C-alpha cells in the first residue's frame, strides 16, 4: 500500500477523494450529538463564520442546525480495478465534554460542504480511469514510490492523510526504459538491409546519436567481403591496443588500401560521414598501422594524413575562396626577416681577431705629471697614425697626428659617426678643430645675431 499525503481539505483548491458515506454520516451525527449535549455547559462563544453554500440558500435563520447535516449517502459502487480512497479516521472525542467544541463544529461544517462534491469527483476519477485503460498493457512493472519530504516545495500542509490502494493491472508487454536499439537484418545475404527496432522509453539526443554510431560500427564490422576478393593479407601487428573500438581498428588494419580507396570512390558520402565522426587520434593510429605494415616496394596508395582530411588542397583553394579569399600582404619587413639569419658567436670573435691583426696596434704609456698616452696605429689605407690622449683637469684631450690625406678621411668618418650617434641617441658631441678659431667663435654667437647687417 502506497501512502500519499495531500493538502488539508480546508483549502478550496484541493478536493478529497471519496469515502464510504455511512462512516461520514456516523461521524457527523456524533459531532452533532456532542454539540447538542454540551450546549448548556459551554461558555458563550462567538458564532463561527460559515461560507455561503448552495443548500443554505432559502433557509431561515432558525434552521442553522440543518446545515451541519450531510446529504443522504449515495450507494457505494464497487468496480474492479478501482482505487479505494478514504480519509484517515479522526480521534474519538467522547471523553472531551469539558473542552470548547467550536473548532470541532467548524471542521464538521467544512467537511459537510466538501462531502457534497464527492459524486462529481467520483465521476472525474471514473472518466480518467476509463481514458487510461487502453494504456494498461504498457504500465506493468511501473511503480510509483511517494512519500513526505521536507525539501519538496510541494509538501502538503494539511492534517488529513490519504491512503491509496492500487490493484494489479493486467498487461502483456513490460516497459523497458533507456534501452539501446537492436538491429535485426531482414536478409543475411543482402548487404545493408536492416531494421532498427526501438524499445519503449525516453531517449536523449546524445543516446540516440551513440546508438546510431554503435549500429553503424557493428554493420561495418559484420559487412561481408566481395566475391572477387581473395584472403586478406595480415598487415597489422598481432598485438592491438585494447580500445573501445577494437573490432573497428582491426577491420581497418586488415582491409587493403586498394579496397579502402574503391569503397571511398563508390560511397563518397559514407566515407565523409565516417571520417567526420572519427577523431584525430584514431586517424593517426590507423594511418600508422597502414604505413608500418605495407611493403614500400609494392605499388600501393599512400594513406591520407589527418591534416589532409581536414584541410583543403592547394589547388582547390582558389575555387573555394575565389570570392572571399584575399592573399596576405607582404611588407618589406617580411622580406628582410626572411633573409636574416642568426649569427654565431664564434664568427664575431674571429672578426675581432682579424681586425686586430690588420690594425697592428701599439700602445705606449708614459709616466709623469703630464699623464699623456700615445697610441700608434698602422692602417692599410691611412698609413701610420699616432693618437695622443692627454688628461687635463676636468677634460680629456685627444690629438691625432697623421698625413693630410689621412686627416681628411678621418674628418669625414668622424662626421658620419657623429651623425649616426645623434640619430641613435641625441647627445652633446662635437668635433672641433683648433685652427678654425673663427668658426668656433661663430658657433658661440646668438642665433639672432646672424640677421644683423655687417659693416
From Swiss-Prot:
Q: Where is this region: Disordered?
A: 38-82, 430-455
Read off the Gene3D superfamilies from this record.
3.30.750.140
Q: Which UniProt keywords apply?
A: Cytoplasm, Plasmid, Virulence
| CDD domains associated with the record | T3SS_YscP_C (cd17467)
Output the Pfam families linked to this UniProt entry.
Flg_hook
Q: Name one GO cellular component term.
A: cytoplasm
List compositional bias (Basic and acidic residues) regions by residue number.
43-69, 439-449
Q: Does the keyword Cytoplasm apply?
A: yes
Indicate where this protein resides in the cell.
Cytoplasm
- Going by the entry's taxonomy, the superkingdom of the source organism is recorded as Bacteria
The family annotation for this protein states:
Belongs to the SpaN family.
Role noted for this protein: Component of the yop secretion machinery.
NCBIfam families cross-referenced by the UniProt entry: type_III_yscP
Q: What is this protein called?
A: Yop proteins translocation protein P
Q: What is the lineage of its organism?
A: Bacteria, Pseudomonadati, Pseudomonadota, Gammaproteobacteria, Enterobacterales
Amino acid at each position: 500500500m502506497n501512502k500519499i499525503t495531500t493538502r488539508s481539505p480546508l483549502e478550496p483548491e484541493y478536493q478529497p477523494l471519496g469515502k464510504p458515506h455511512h462512516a461520514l454520516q456516523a461521524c457527523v451525527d456524533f459531532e452533532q450529538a456532542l454539540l447538542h449535549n454540551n450546549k448548556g455547559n459551554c461558555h458563550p462563544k462567538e458564532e463561527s463564520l460559515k461560507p455561503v453554500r448552495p443548500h443554505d440558500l432559502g433557509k431561515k435563520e432558525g434552521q442553522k442546525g440543518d446545515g451541519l447535516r450531510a446529504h443522504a449517502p449515495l450507494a457505494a459502487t464497487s468496480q474492479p480495478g478501482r482505487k479505494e480512497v478514504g480519509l484517515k479516521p479522526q480521534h474519538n472525542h467522547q471523553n472531551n465534554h469539558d473542552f470548547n467544541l467550536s473548532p470541532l463544529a467548524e471542521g464538521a461544517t467544512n467537511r459537510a460542504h466538501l462531502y457534497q462534491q464527492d459524486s462529481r469527483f467520483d465521476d472525474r476519477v471514473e472518466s480518467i480511469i476509463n481514458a487510461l485503460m487502453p494504456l494498461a498493457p504498457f504500465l506493468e512493472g511501473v511503480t510509483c514510490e511517494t512519500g513526505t519530504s521536507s525539501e519538496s516545495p510541494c509538501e502538503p500542509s494539511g492534517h488529513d492523510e490519504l491512503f491509496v490502494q492500487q490493484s494489479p493491472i493486467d498487461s502483456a508487454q513490460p516497459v523497458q526504459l533507456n534501452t539501446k536499439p537492436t538491429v535485426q537484418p531482414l536478409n543475411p545475404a543482402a548487404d545493408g538491409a536492416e531494421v532498427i527496432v526501438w524499445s519503449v522509453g525516453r531517449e536523449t539526443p546524445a543516446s540516440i546519436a551513440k546508438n546510431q554510431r554503435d549500429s553503424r560500427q557493428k554493420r561495418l564490422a559484420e559487412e561481408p567481403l566481395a566475391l572477387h576478393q581473395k584472403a586478406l593479407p595480415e598487415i597489422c601487428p598481432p598485438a592491438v591496443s585494447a580500445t573501445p573500438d577494437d573490432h573497428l581498428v582491426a577491420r581497418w588494419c586488415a582491409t587493403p588500401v586498394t579496397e579502402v580507396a574503391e569503397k571511398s570512390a563508390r560511397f563518397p558520402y559514407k566515407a565523409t560521414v565516417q571520417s567526420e565522426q572519427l577523431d584525430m587520434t584514431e586517424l593517426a593510429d590507423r594511418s600508422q598501422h597502414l604505413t608500418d605494415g605495407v611493403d614500400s616496394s609494392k605499388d600501393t596508395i599512400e594513406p591520407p594524413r589527418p591534416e589532409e582530411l581536414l584541410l583543403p588542397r592547394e589547388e582547390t583553394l582558389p575555387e573555394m575562396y575565389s570570392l572571399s579569399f584575399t592573399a596576405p600582404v607582404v611588407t618589406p619587413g617580411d622580406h628582410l626577416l626572411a633573409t636574416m639569419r642568426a649569427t654565431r658567436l664564434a664568427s664575431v670573435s674571429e672578426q675581432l681577431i682579424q681586425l686586430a691583426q690588420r690594425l697592428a696596434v701599439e700602445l705606449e704609456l708614459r709616466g709623469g705629471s703630464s699623464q699623456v698616452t700615445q697610441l700608434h696605429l698602422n692602417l692599410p689605407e691611412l698609413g701610420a697614425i699616432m693618437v695622443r690622449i692627454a688628461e687635463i683637469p676636468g677634460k680629456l684631450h685627444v690629438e691625432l697626428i697623421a698625413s693630410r690625406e689621412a686627416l681628411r678621411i678621418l674628418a669625414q668618418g668622424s662626421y658620419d659617426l657623429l651623425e649616426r650617434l645623434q640619430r641613435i641617441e641625441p647627445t652633446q658631441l662635437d668635433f672641433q678643430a683648433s685652427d678654425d678659431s673663427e668658426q668656433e667663435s661663430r658657433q658661440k654667437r646668438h642665433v639672432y645675431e646672424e640677421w644683423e647687417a655687417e659693416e
